Amino acid sequence: MSSSSAASIGPPQPPPPPAPPEEEKKCLNSELWHACAGPLVCLPTVGTRVVYFPQGHSEQVAASTNKEVEGHIPNYPNLPAQLICQLHDVTMHADVETDEVYAQMTLQPLNPQEQNDAYLPAEMGIMSKQPTNYFCKTLTASDTSTHGGFSVPRRAAERVFPPLDFTQQPPAQELIARDIHDIEWKFRHIFRGQPKRHLLTTGWSVFVSAKRLVAGDSVLFIWNEKNQLLLGIRRASRPQTVMPSSVLSSDSMHIGLLAAAAHAAATNSRFTIFYNPRASPSEFVIPLSKYIKAVFHTRISVGMRFRMLFETEESSVRRYMGTITEVSDADPVRWPSSYWRSVKVGWDESTAGERPPRVSLWEIEPLTTFPMYPSLFPLRVKHPWYSGVASLHDDSNALMWLRGVAGEGGFQSLNFQSPGIGSWGQQRLHPSLLSSDHDQYQAVVAAAAASQSGGYLKQQFLHLQQPMQSPQEHCNLNPLLQQQILQQASQQQIINPDAQNIQTMLSPSAIQQQLQQLQQMQQVQNDQKQKIQPDQSYQVPTSAVLPSPTSLPSHLREKFGFSDPNANSSSFITSSSSDNMLDSSFLQGSSKAVDLSRFNQPVASEQQQQQQQAWKQKFMGSQSVSFGGSVLHNSPTSKDGSVENKIGRDVQNQSLFSPQVDSSSLLYNMVPNLTSNVSDGNLSTIPSGSTYLQNAMYGCLDDSSGLLQNTGENDPATRTFVKVYKSGSVGRSLDITRFSNYAELREELGQMFGIKGQLDDPDRSGWQLVFVDRENDVLLLGDDPWESFVNSVWYIKILSPEDVHKMGKQGNDPRYLS
């Protein structure tokens, strides 16, 4: 009896369950998919908001079919150039025939009301997790011949393949690799030839024939964390000249995608798109946070230098430098007011023909920019966000910088003027930041002005003695005044309230009184300088010291960061404490002067002016000395009202009471970074590129030494030691003049922090080295010439892979730091 007839005896067997669909049956390996897609591919995160560009989608169709959009294709005037959508689903696929990877995304446009709803920006996207142990090789003619084998570079074979047993002659082993469809391929790995080399022989020709590989295609071998060998394919771009009859024509594909997007935008319904990372010139589905950062928080201009990442043949990345030559619409007829490829560029290298003539803002990294986005590095800041004030990520007012005030429509109110800060994209502060009593403000301004021994503030006060002009005249003069003040601040490394702030907040009588007091104090200092000699103890009489706010009420002392009058008078306070002397209320109060629409309003009532005079008298009666970010108090004092202080031989100490003390350094350390007035849409009154915009809302990086260096130490000609910081470790000082190149510096830093070898190859280890220059710009270590780096470095930051990962979650793209 045959087995088939025997099997029929007995109870009938239940029918087998239906086979699941191909997509449900297999889940593609994400690591292999991203490796095949390329190191620059970054898929958005499911559940986040993205910006979809139909114009970029059309480019993918044109690149795939080798046919541009024809003029007879109907235009859809109701289809915006960019659609803000909710990303509901992302699925990774690979073509069964060609192994070409692509992604399927389900999008749903947001209506204007949803765009204005509170939204917390998520990460920039799913970072392309490139494998650490892999190699990519472009196939040659001999690699694809039926009689030969696949030649593997020696270092690649030793790093990726399991080790050979060299006791055998010849050394050989069998390799089993899985492709994107989870199909196993077996190869014979042998080490032979003259000279000896690694070859894949048996099984290789079968693989080449089955995959229809030709010279120019690339293969990837990956050794993953599960000790598995993965195999991927990247086909060379070969546009099809003749499309199969089963495939839609190019015109039909263009019309289809435009019609689907227009219908979805009109009905707020879901629609599906396909993204082919190897065929598409650029990503056309961008995370909303990345789009906002690039378009509204990075100001560019014609002539600005930039760099951009490109993929190399070895599946790594390389930066190319260029210059911005024009900012305009790429297609003003079909896609007006579009940010897609709105930047026309010129490339430096002779291979510029291979680079695109136009790029998008989120693809480039300007070299001279003033970002208004939260710092990339979670270093200690001088001024944390104040309690009771809504932050950028507040639950009740999340992402308030993405929303307009009453009557504005968020994205619907966009004006395409030029990439940078638009009227809609201006940052706005919570009203509580702008509410400060005039008397408190006047008191703090008086203390700050009195602590300056002359120089910059005195010049500003003298300038303000001129008769007050009409509001219209001030509106005309304000930009010029701001530009002059900002230039002076840049030269003296200070951030100072402009003349308008002081003029609107202090009455003429108060200014005159403060001028007289400044002159008296400077004369006293001149007298003291003649009496002081080195190596002696001195008693500073009460008339010789500058006034301080020690007589303020306790609630104001706490509010403005003044020290306790009962504290030890012989000790210096850290720079962070002195920086806090002028707190948010003062800063925000001063920023009100930027809004010239309020210039004709009364500054203070008569009662407030009387309170101001009373506060000034209290300030002038108190006693303290402010030096370069440190405050020396005289309370408690001795019976005769004086305090003893040792003055050493140090030149710095000898100059403490000198009237020639650099007022810029005093003001730099005493007054923290000023918060710009970004409420009520008046950011346009502040010049672009201003340091007000750079450090206003986010504070600045603190000097962990406690006191900012003096001007001599900040001089590049005299300062050779730089600070090096690493999370979880104590900061170190390093003399960079000991080294002659980056390799020596990396080796020393690796030994110093116990991570030897991790800094040599950042692409493999994940560790990154960045530095902050004297202009407070964050740059990648190694991009600049060595001499330029030595002359400009302020401090160095070592970023672990975890630090880079955290930065990605904060809404930044760590690829631009790799």
UniProtKB/Swiss-Prot annotation:
<comment type="function">
    <text>Auxin response factors (ARFs) are transcriptional factors that bind specifically to the DNA sequence 5'-TGTCTC-3' found in the auxin-responsive promoter elements (AuxREs).</text>
</comment>
<dbReference type="Pfam" id="PF02362">
    <property type="entry name" value="B3"/>
</dbReference>
<feature type="domain" description="PB1">
    <location>
        <begin position="719"/>
        <end position="803"/>
    </location>
</feature>
<keyword id="KW-0539">Nucleus</keyword>
<dbReference type="GO" id="GO:0005634">
    <property type="term" value="C:nucleus"/>
</dbReference>
<dbReference type="InterPro" id="IPR053793">
    <property type="entry name" value="PB1-like"/>
</dbReference>
<dbReference type="Pfam" id="PF06507">
    <property type="entry name" value="ARF_AD"/>
</dbReference>
<dbReference type="InterPro" id="IPR033389">
    <property type="entry name" value="AUX/IAA_dom"/>
</dbReference>
<dbReference type="GO" id="GO:0003677">
    <property type="term" value="F:DNA binding"/>
</dbReference>
<comment type="subunit">
    <text>Homodimers and heterodimers.</text>
</comment>
<feature type="compositionally biased region" description="Pro residues">
    <location>
        <begin position="11"/>
        <end position="20"/>
    </location>
</feature>
<feature type="region of interest" description="Disordered">
    <location>
        <begin position="526"/>
        <end position="565"/>
    </location>
</feature>
<dbReference type="InterPro" id="IPR015300">
    <property type="entry name" value="DNA-bd_pseudobarrel_sf"/>
</dbReference>
<feature type="region of interest" description="Disordered">
    <location>
        <begin position="629"/>
        <end position="648"/>
    </location>
</feature>
<feature type="region of interest" description="Disordered">
    <location>
        <begin position="1"/>
        <end position="24"/>
    </location>
</feature>
<dbReference type="InterPro" id="IPR010525">
    <property type="entry name" value="ARF_dom"/>
</dbReference>
<keyword id="KW-0927">Auxin signaling pathway</keyword>
<dbReference type="InterPro" id="IPR044835">
    <property type="entry name" value="ARF_plant"/>
</dbReference>
<feature type="compositionally biased region" description="Low complexity">
    <location>
        <begin position="1"/>
        <end position="10"/>
    </location>
</feature>
<dbReference type="GO" id="GO:0006355">
    <property type="term" value="P:regulation of DNA-templated transcription"/>
</dbReference>
<keyword id="KW-0805">Transcription regulation</keyword>
<keyword id="KW-0804">Transcription</keyword>
<dbReference type="InterPro" id="IPR003340">
    <property type="entry name" value="B3_DNA-bd"/>
</dbReference>
<comment type="similarity">
    <text>Belongs to the ARF family.</text>
</comment>
<dbReference type="GO" id="GO:0009734">
    <property type="term" value="P:auxin-activated signaling pathway"/>
</dbReference>
<feature type="compositionally biased region" description="Polar residues">
    <location>
        <begin position="629"/>
        <end position="640"/>
    </location>
</feature>
<feature type="DNA-binding region" description="TF-B3">
    <location>
        <begin position="135"/>
        <end position="237"/>
    </location>
</feature>
<protein>
    <recommendedName>
        <fullName>Auxin response factor 12</fullName>
    </recommendedName>
</protein>
<keyword id="KW-0238">DNA-binding</keyword>
<dbReference type="Pfam" id="PF02309">
    <property type="entry name" value="AUX_IAA"/>
</dbReference>
